[in-house]
Structure formats: structure tokens, C-alpha cells
A protein has these predicted regions:
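Positively charged, low-complexity intrinsically disordered leader regions
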Residues: 2-45
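Short, glycine-rich nucleotide/cofactor-binding loops
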Residues: 40-44, 175-181, 261-266
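Short, hydrophobic/aliphatic alpha-helical segments
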Residues: 39-55, 89, 168-172, 317-327
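N-terminal active-site beta-alpha-beta segment that forms phosphate/nucleotide-binding
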Residues: 55-232
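Short beta-strand segments
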Residues: 27, 65, 107-109, 171-175, ...
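Small-aliphatic-rich amphipathic alpha-helix that forms the alpha element of a beta-alpha
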Residues: 49-56, 62, 273-276
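Acidic-glycine-rich active-site phosphate/pyrophosphate-binding loop
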Residues: 35-46, 127, 164-168, 221, ...
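Conserved phosphate- and dinucleotide-binding cores of soluble alpha/beta proteins
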Residues: 203-204, 210-366
Length: 366
């Protein structure tokens, strides 16, 4: 990848430890794209709030933040023995788990941290604490490798669909980019890998849905892709059908927050309508997801908890003045579920899964 893009990735790293390893150093995504500011989180309350307020967001990045959050805050636990330490650790885990309900990576990462502590329980508490830092580092490093694999597989699909001399049109929703992960993103990974494999930014034309109400597409995806030199167009969510009808979109890539075992996939609100449109216009619709996003305990989309957020995000946020009457009832779910039969494939790091998804997940040992 070219140096400028690598430098950009370095500048916007979502989550890392402070050099003293006593806190989380995150880029505050609520300030992007106007202000690129890193902030430090030390207490469990600061970490909880940063996740809740979307200062750090996107399923894999939330998992990494929670893992480091557990390591950093567990380091301060004063306990006589493992049993007392473990009790305090589980309290931290349960508290961080209550920050957001939908992205399963949060619970997956927290469980992995708990399991690591249990695996070390015969050792000294200092060793257990050090192991928690090691596990969080590992979760972060694995995420880079996982999204790279997703990118390779997605790039394979782009190569098949691309016509000589024409940019391939890709539509994406929300931000499943570098800002949502530890490096390549999931939905953006095929684009970044395309650059690594020698494509020019003009070989692709990425259409970013603005993504109401929190504008992750406009503020974050368009920001990253413009930095990468990829031809990028931003449209409001209700403009996607016009683009699809005109033949400009050849493939859709989105991320996701939780996949049920039958393939139903929860992602940012509005994803389901993109999938319905894609089906109508005969455009392949792919979900890009690390296998940690597949929740084997969840039979179908009806069992995925959907986060409801504040009405203010719809009525007044981003506006100079309130744009809806006081007291109006507001519907503001943060996610929706795309039915599995609308999904062409789910690209995981282990392979591309097709319907019946449960069989493919089993085949790939997910
Ligand atoms: O509310 P957000 O911004 O955390 O929602 C993010 C998404 O919906 C992403 O598409 C998803 O987490 C996948 S990120 C690789």
C-alpha cells in the first residue's frame, strides 16, 4: 500500500494503548471529519461512555476497545487471591457489556478476556494481569489479519465483475472501514486490497450512503476513501435506488454487527432496504464479517437485540435548530436485520459463505 495511505491508517488508528499502557488512546470519531483528535480513556466509566457515545464504534473496534478496557481496568484490581480478582473482573466485564447491545463482537471479546484470565488462574495475579494485556493485543492483531483476508476474498469478487476500461461501481452503507476495525475495515477491505494489488483509485467508484441519523457514511467512509484516493460519491440514503436503476452499481459491500446462524444479519439501520433494492435490480449484495460476528447461539434475526437510540439524533442533531415539532414521537432503531435470503454471500476471513448459511458456517468450522 502506498505510504500516504499507511500514514493515514496510522493517524486514525481506532484504539491503541497509551505508551505507559495505563489507558486507551482512541480517535474521537464523533469529531471526524472536521477535527482529528485523540483522547485518552482510563476509567471503566470513560470507556463505557466512549462506546455508548460512538467515540469508538463499529463492531470489531468496539471489541478491541472492550478488550483493552478490561486489561487496563483489571490492572488496578487489588485482590488477595484469584477468586477475589475474578469477582472484580466479572463486574468490569458485565459493566462494559452493557454499553451497547447489538454488536456481538463486544461480548465475544469480553468473554475471550474472561476465558484468558481463567486459563491463567493458577499463576500469580501479576501474571494474570499481564496475560490480559497480551490477549487484548492479540485480539487487535488478529483483527488486522482477518480483515486482510476478507479483503482478499472481496477483491476476488471485484476482479470477476470488473469490465476492462470501466470503474467498478460499489455501494456501501454506514462505515465498515478502517475506523470500524484495527486496519482495513471489512466492507472497505476489498477496496484497500485492490489498491495493494495495483489498482488505481479510479478503477473503483464507491458510492457511500450518507447513513442517517448519525452520518457514518458521510463523516467516516467518505472521509477514509477520499484519503485513499478512491473515486467516491456521497449520496443520501434515499438516493440509492436511482443509482442502482441507472446501472452504476455492480456490487454492494456492507459490514455487520451480528449474524444469526441462519444468515440473518444485523447491520446499521437502512442496510435491509439496500439489500431489498439490490435484489430488485439484480445486484449482488455481500455482507463482510469476521467470523467473530457470527453468533452461533442466535437462531435467527428475531433473536438479535436491536439498540434504540435517543430521539435527538433524528430531530435536532446536526441541524442549526430543531427540525421536528417538540414532543413528536420518534422511531430510532440503530440497526436492522437483513433477511438471509436477500444476501448473496457473507465474506468471512475463512471463506465466502452462501445459503444455506448454517451449512457453510459448519463447513468452514465457524
Ligand atoms: O452504530 P455503529 O456506527 O457502531 O454501527 C456500525 C455498523 O453498523 C457497521 O457496519 C458494523 O459495525 C460493521 S463494522 C466493520
Amino acid at each position: 500500500m502506498h505510504k500516504e495511505l499507511d500514514d493515514f491508517f496510522e493517524d486514525v488508528i481506532t484504539v491503541r494503548l497509551t505508551p505507559e499502557r495505563d489507558g486507551l488512546d482512541i480517535i474521537d470519531q464523533t469529531l471526524l471529519p472536521g477535527i482529528r483528535k485523540r483522547i485518552c480513556l482510563r476509567t471503566k466509566e470513560e470507556i463505557w461512555n466512549a462506546i455508548r457515545e460512538l467515540k469508538v464504534r463499529g463492531a470489531p473496534a468496539i471489541g478491541v476497545a472492550a478488550a483493552y478496557g478490561m486489561a487496563v481496568t483489571a490492572d488496578h484490581i487489588q485482590a488477595e487471591d484469584f477468586s477475589a480478582f475474578y469477582h472484580a473482573l466479572v463486574e468490569i466485564k458485565n459493566y462494559l457489556a452493557s454499553s451497547r447491545p447489538t454488536a456481538v463482537n463486544l461480548f465475544w471479546a469480553l468473554n475471550r478476556m474472561e476465558q484468558r484470565a481463567l486459563a491463567e488462574k493458577e499463576k500469580s495475579l501479576d501474571t494474570v494481569k499481564a496475560a490480559l494485556f497480551e490477549e487484548a493485543d492479540r485480539i487487535r492483531e488478529e483483527d488486522v489479519a482477518i480483515s486482510r483476508n476478507i479483503g482478499e476474498l472481496g477483491f476476488g469478487l471485484l476482479k470477476k465483475l470488473k469490465k476492462e476500461g470501466e470503474p467498478i461501481g460499489i455501494l456501501t452503507h454506514c462505515n465498515a472501514g478502517t475506523l470500524a476495525t484495527a486496519k482495513y475495515g471489512t466492507a472497505t477491505a476489498p477496496m484497500y486490497l485492490a489498491l495493494e494489488h495495483g489498482w488505481e483509485g479510479t478503477d473503483m467508484h464507491v458510492y457511500c450512503d450518507e447513513t442517517r441519523p448519525l452520518l457514518q457514511g458521510a463523516r467516516l467512509t467518505a472521509y477514509e476513501l477520499c484519503h485513499a484516493g478512491i473515486t467516491t460519491t456521497l449520496q443520501c440514503d434515499n438516493m440509492a435506488s436511482v443509482l442502482m436503476k441507472s446501472g452504476k452499481i455492480h456490487i454492494v459491500f456492507t459490514g455487520c454487527d451480528r449474524v444469526a446462524i441462519n444468515g440473518d444479519s444485523a447491520n446499521k439501520i437502512g442496510t435491509n432496504q439496500v439489500a431489498i433494492l439490490a435484489r430488485h435490480y439484480g445486484i449482488p449484495f455481500y455482507i463482510c464479517a469476521p467470523s467473530s460476528t457470527i453468533d452461533k447461539s442466535c437462531p435467527d434475526g428475531d433473536h438479535i437485540p436491536i439498540e434504540q437510540r435517543s430521539p435527538d439524533e433524528v430531530t435536532q442533531m446536526w441541524y442549526k435548530e430543531r427540525m421536528a415539532p417538540e414532543g413528536v414521537d420518534v422511531f430510532n432503531p440503530a440497526f436492522d436485520v437483513t433477511d438471509h435470503d436477500l444476501i448473496t454471500g457473507i465474506i468471512t476471513e475463512k471463506g465466502v459463505c452462501h445459503a444455506p448459511f448454517a451449512e457453510d458456517f459448519a463447513r468452514l468450522k465457524i
